Every structure is written in structure tokens, then in C-alpha cells.
UniProtKB/Swiss-Prot annotation:
It catalyses: tRNA(Arg) + L-arginine + ATP = L-arginyl-tRNA(Arg) + AMP + diphosphate. It is an enzyme of class 6 (ligase). One of its GO terms (molecular function) is ATP binding. NCBIfam families: argS. This is Arginine--tRNA ligase. Its EC number is 6.1.1.19. It is found in: Cytoplasm. It comes from Brucella melitensis biotype 1 (strain ATCC 23456 / CCUG 17765 / NCTC 10094 / 16M). It comes from the Bacteria. InterPro entries: aa-tRNA-synth_I_CS, Arg-tRNA-ligase, Arg-tRNA-synth_N, Arg-tRNA-synth_N_sf, ArgRS_core, DALR_anticod-bd, Rossmann-like_a/b/a_fold, tRNAsynth_Ia_anticodon-bd. GO terms for biological process: arginyl-tRNA aminoacylation. Belongs to the class-I aminoacyl-tRNA synthetase family. Pfam families: Arg_tRNA_synt_N (PF03485), DALR_1 (PF05746), tRNA-synt_1d (PF00750).
């Protein structure tokens, strides 16, 4: 249960009980009332701004109103004390019995604790990675892959019906260049000396194998075909090979998509999907024939100094109108974006999230304009931009050669440090802030390495369970037994740990609402820190050890507390896509 939602309801009922009314009549607007943890834990367990946001409406000084509300809240059987602070904040401290009851709820729910109905089954499409199928994924793709994947997992846990999607950019000019690059490698595999790879083609050695496979399958047949026919075959085989490589890289990172949507699908039957999308916009009055003034700076490839078919995107929030069709009748890349969005919307998605690299910042307004125009404002589209990842080794920047074809791949990083450190650390900064990734730091065993610190807490929980088996003979810990004596958990440090656990449902919902999966990584680190601190207290004070051989009931209660810590760590790490180890190796 979300205890903050619980007390939000209790506080609003209290406002009704004291018959609080607006001075001008009508009903009070309670929507701005906030109920959250105090910024300073010493101030209490629950804080609310109710008096401050309602004082003007009821015509009463905020502190006086706060005192009135506070007095009424003292009647709540779970409230130990109520204080008014600052300009009118109300801080509540709850009784230990309340936390003991809540801990029992957490224990009974297991790893489902924190799962929410917030999404109410609403369909959400999360598109992420969508790297061009022209080669292996580099480290720059890694952050978006993790952010998108964890956000999708988080939304599922919060009750949304989520589809993870990858858009395969397999219809652009870069694919033609890729096919010609592989054709060269094919000729090389047949024994021809190709010399240095010509400028403009893909030089990477990863294409050598594709050329060899084509040579093994076709022999010299492709050379005997008309060039267009041969290139079409090479293109299909190469896209399949590149996507197989990309899927393998993503699998190594524990990233899995539900849908792989081919851009070429939009161009089937003379680009029927694109034509239908443009016709739909035309019927709504969003399309016209016109000529755009030349933009400042470098000219985009879809600008022409002649009449084009244009989208009135400025009428729906964009900076400039956008070309949909060139003067020669061919469609712009942007027209494909329109058709792709319409396809999602037609499949019942009213909420779509695009996770893109920071270099796509210029696309945000045009994509939002498409969403408004296609859905008549009914669909919500959010674009999350992921800033760059800078690689370091022992604090020194990792130099990458600018020579063509040489870069650090996603697989290089995963193979060196492991999947879990990569996933966790890619979340340890908000997506729109640059991130430094140090190969040495993410593998060191210290508090300064967040993923180690969190996974070590999970392992320590299980070490407590093993100690219980050795010292108390409790091999199969029973949750009913562990939860039967929570009234024995009275030490302030134990109650503080329960408070931290109780924040989890609110954390899940707030991270889902704001689409900020990094909040989960931060919370898990804080929870791990609280648990390690409790462990250390037991090392310093025998009375606070998790296992008291001479007090089996207290031991069971503390084991129940450890079990809930383990459950929440497991739940959070599962959402992140990392393991919750039972021991460190």
C-alpha cells in the first residue's frame, strides 16, 4: 500500500470533518494538497502543505489554519504527534504500531509489494534503441537502450499495458550505401583485390563475414545478375545479418523488444501507408502546396527552392512547416515519421514514448506536432533525450580513434564489466544529463560503486537467512512465523528502515508518472545504505543483531524485516534488469 496515498485520504477526510469551507462559498479545491516524506526525517514521517495551499481560499492565516488541522489530526489512532513548522507545514509522526502493521502487509505481498494499478491497463508504446542496421551498436546506443527498457519495465510494474518497440531504419539512403559496401566485401570473398575501401562506404571489418556468407551461398551468381537485382538480394541479406548482430548485442545487455517494426513496411504497395497518412492530414486541413523560405545555416536535405507538399506543423506547435513530398513526387523521411506514428495510433496507443539520442533534439517539436495533428490532440507523445556517455578508465578519458570503422561497441563494454554494472550505471544520472562511465569504478567493491553496494545488500540479506539456518535451525523461513511478532520491532533504527521500505510504492508511481527510471536506482542505493547501516549497528551493539539466539521471537521479527528488504531489492533490481544475488562471487 502507498502510505502517502493513505494519509492523503485521511487528511482530506479530516478537512471535511472540521467543515472547512471557502470564504466565497462552493467547494474547496483539494488538488494541490501534497502529502510526502518531510525533507528532514527528524521532522516526522508525513508532511503536508494542506494549510498553505488552502489558507487563501478559506481566508485564514496559514499557521493558524495549520494549527486547526493539526489538532484534528491528533485524533487519528495511528498518529503519535503532529507539529506545525515554518510558514504552515504540518508534520505527522506515526506510532510504531502503524509501521509494524505496514511491515506485515509488505511481507505478505512479497516481491509484488509496490506493484501499482496506476496505469489501469492503459496501452503505452515505448520505442527505444532503433539504431540504424548498418553495423554493431556502439556505446552511445547503450544508454538509450537501458533507459527505454527500464522505463518500460517500470511502467508495466505500475499497471500499464506496455509494448517495447524497435524501429528498423531499413529504407533510407544509408541502406543503399551499406549494400554497396557489402557487395565490395562479397567480391573480396571471391578473391578479388578491392584495395582501400572507397570514401562514403562502410569500412568496418564486421562486413567481411557478410560478404563471405554471400560468396558461400551464391558463388559468382550475384556478379552475373543485373546490378539492381543483385543489390536487392545483398540488401535483404545484409539487413538480416545486421539485425541478428544487434539483437545479440541487446540480448547480452538483457534488452528485449516485443516488436521490430521495419521502415520498409511503410513503403509497401507504392508507399500506401505514407499516402494514407498524408491523405488523413489533408482531410483535416493540415497539408498544403507551398514553398518554404531557405532555413538559416546548413540546408536540410528535404528543402527545395520550389513548390512542395507541406505539413502545417506551425499550427500545431512546431517552429516551421515541414515538407512531406518533394517536387519529384518522392516522400521525405519526415513523411515516414507521420505514417509510423499513425500506425501506432491506429493500433490503439494513446500514449507513446520515444527514447532518442540528444542529437535528435531538433526532432522533438515536429514529432509532437505530428501527434497533435494525427490524433486531434487525443494522443500523448513524450520524447526522452539521452545525453552522451563519456568513457573513462581510472579517471582518464578513453581515447577512441577517429579512423573510420574504429569505435567502442556496446558488446565491448558489456564483455569487460558485465551486464548488471552497465544497466545500473546507465541509470545513475537523469537521462538528460551527461554521464561519466569509468570501467574501473563500476567493478570496484566499495560503497562508491552503486551497483556493487546494492547487490551486496541483497547478498547480505541471504547471508542472514543462512545464519538463521545455522544458529536457529530455521531452514525454510515461514512468512507467517516471521510476521507474527512484529510488535517486538521497537528500536528507532528498525522503524527507520521500515519507513524507507514504505516509500517504495510512492517511488514506483512517481518514477512512472514522471518517466524517470533513474529514481529507482537512487532509491535502491538509499535502501541498501540503510540496510548496511543496520547491519553495522548490530556489529557494534549485540542487542541489535538480526539474530538473537536467546530470543527466537525477536529473531523471527527481524528476519521478517530482512525478508522485506530482500524482496524490495529483488523487485527493484528486476525492474532495472539486473540480478539480486544471494551471495557475492
Amino acid at each position: 500500500m502507498n502510505i502517502f496515498a493513505d494519509f492523503d485520504a485521511r487528511i482530506k477526510k479530516t478537512l471535511q470533518d472540521i467543515d472547512l469551507k471557502p470564504k466565497d462559498g462552493g467547494e474547496l479545491d483539494l488538488s494541490r494538497i501534497g502529502v510526502e516524506p518531510p525533507r528532514d526525517a527528524s521532522h516526522g514521517d508525513i508532511a503536508t502543505n494542506a494549510a498553505m495551499v488552502l489558507s487563501k481560499a478559506v481566508g485564514q492565516n496559514p499557521r493558524e489554519l495549520a494549527a486547526r488541522i493539526a489538532e484534528a489530526l491528533k485524533a487519528d489512532e495511528d498518529v503519535e504527534s503532529v507539529d506545525v513548522a515554518g510558514p504552515g507545514f504540518i508534520n505527522l509522526r506515526l506510532k510504531a504500531s502503524y509501521w509494524q502493521r505496514e511491515l506485515l502487509v509488505m511481507l505478505n505481498e512479497g516481491t509484488d509489494f509496490g506493484r501499482s494499478r496506476l496505469g489501469a491497463g492503459k496501452k503505452v508504446n515505448v520505442e527505444y534503441v532503433s539504431a540504424n542496421p548498418t553495423g554493431p551498436m556502439h556505446v552511445g546506443h547503450c544508454r538509450g537502450a537501458v533507459v527505454g527498457d527500464v522505463l518500460a519495465n517500470l511502467l508495466k510494474f505500475a499497471g500499464y499495458d506496455v509494448v517495447k518497440e524497435y524501429y528498423i531504419n531499413d529504407a533510407g539512403a544509408q541502406i543503399d550505401v551499406l549494400a554497396r559496401s557489402v557487395m565490395l566485401r562479397y567480391r573480396e570473398a571471391l578473391g578479388e583485390s578491392i584495395g582501400e575501401i572507397p570514401a562514403g562506404l562502410y569500412p568496418g571489418d564486421y562486413l567481411v563475414r557478410v560478404g563471405q556468407e554471400l560468396a558461400g551461398e551464391f558463388g559468382t551468381k550475384l556478379l552475373e545478375m543485373p546490378e539492381a537485382e543483385a543489390l536487392a538480394i545483398v540488401k535483404d541479406r545484409t539487413i538480416d545479418a545486421m539485425m541478428a548482430m544487434i539483437r545479440a548485442d541487446l540480448d547480452a545487455l538483457n534488452v528485449h523488444h516485443d516488436v521490430f517494426y521495419s521502415e520498409r513496411k511503410l513503403h509497401v504497395d507504392h508507399a500506401r501507408a505514407i499516402r494514407n497518412a498524408i491523405n488523413d492530414l489533408t482531410l483535416k486541413g493540415h497539408v498544403y502546396k507551398g514553398k518554404l523560405p531557405p532555413p538559416k545555416g546548413q540546408l536540410p536535405e528535404d528543402w527545395e527552392d520550389r513548390e512542395q507538399t507541406l505539413f502545417r506543423s506551425t499550427e500545431v506547435g512546431d517552429d516551421i512547416d515541414r515538407p512531406l513530398m518533394k517536387s519529384d513526387g518522392s516522400f521525405t523521411y519526415f513523411a515516414g515519421d507521420v505514417a509510423y506514428f499513425k500506425d501506432k495510433y491506429d493500433h490503439g496507443f494513446n500514449e507513446m514514448i520515444y527514447v532518442l539520442g540528444a542529437d535528435h533534439g531538433g526532432y522533438v517539436k515536429r514529432l509532437e506536432a505530428v501527434a497533435r495533428a494525427v490524433s486531434d490532440g487525443k494522443a500523448k507523445l513524450t520524447v526522452l533525450l539521452c545525453q552522451l556517455v563519456k568513457l573513462f578508465r581510472n579517471g582518464e578519458p578513453v581515447r577512441m580513434s577517429k579512423r573510420a570503422g574504429e569505435f567502442i561497441t556496446l558488446r565491448d563494454v558489456v564483455d569487460e564489466v558485465g551486464r548488471d554494472p552497465v544497466r545500473f550505471m546507465m541509470l545513475y544520472r537523469k537521462n538528460d544529463a551527461p554521464l561519466d562511465f569509468d570501467f574501473a569504478k563500476v567493478t570496484e567493491q566499495s560503497k562508491d560503486n552503486p551497483v556493487f553496494y546494492v547487490q551486496y545488500a541483497s547478498a547480505r540479506c541471504h547471508s542472514v537467512f543462512r545464519q538463521a539456518a545455522d544458529q536457529l535451525g530455521l531452514v525454510d523461513l515461514d512468512r507467517v512465523a516471521m510476521g507474527s511478532h512484529f510488535e517486538k520491532l521497537t528500536d528507532e533504527s528498525e522503524i527507520a528502515l521500515v519507513r524507507k521500505l514504505a516509500e517504495y510504492p510512492r517511488l514506483i508511481e512517481s518514477a512512472a508518472i514522471h518517466q524517470e527510471p533513474h529514481r529507482l536506482a537512487f532509491y535502491l542505493y538509499d535502501l541498501a545504505s540503510s540496510f548496511h547501516s543496520q547491519w553495522n549497528r548490530g556489529a557494534e551493539n549485540p542487542d541489535l543483531r538480526f539474530i538473537k539466539v536467546n530470543d527466537p521471537d525477536l529473531s523471527l521479527a527481524r528476519l521478517g524485516l530482512v525478508q522485506v528488504v530482500s524482496d524490495v531489492l529483488t523487485s527493484g533490481l528486476t525492474i532495472i534488469g539486473a540480478d539480486a544475488p544471494t551471495e557475492m562471487r
